[in-house]
């Protein structure tokens, strides 16, 4: 039979656990601030003033704020989020086509390839109709972006010395692939000897795809 003292301790632990959990839950409920459609509009204005964003990213942000708060408006929260996004578009604070061009251009200048650009615009919720021009431009800049990547990483023509180790070469090809470049284009650039400016200049301007 259990010791009486042990039973007392066990019961105290159970009571503490029960009331402690209730207390924490109550504090959590109290910390959920009320949120209305008007406040949602204010949050959106602050967000677009601070960040360049897409419609999808803004609506995700607003939806998260709704989840973290106590919705007190009569309108449906999801409908309210979409209505706020509509208003931001009418005010020209949101323009997915312009955002896509800016985002793709920045990625290309950082040496990232077409595949990474496409993937990022998809994640950002950009529709095909709004991303098409940006993706086409990234395709036209594929060689320049890959050369920029090689320069940043000191691969191929930008290496201090030639590296003929096959394993090292494949690691470099893999790095190009992770950056969104085609394997064929990566191998063309890596085949250029260090310091051979003429061979580097002779690379095609068009993107090479697998």
Descriptions of predicted regions:
Residues 2-210:
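An alpha-helical, amphipathic repeat domain used for nucleic-acid recognition
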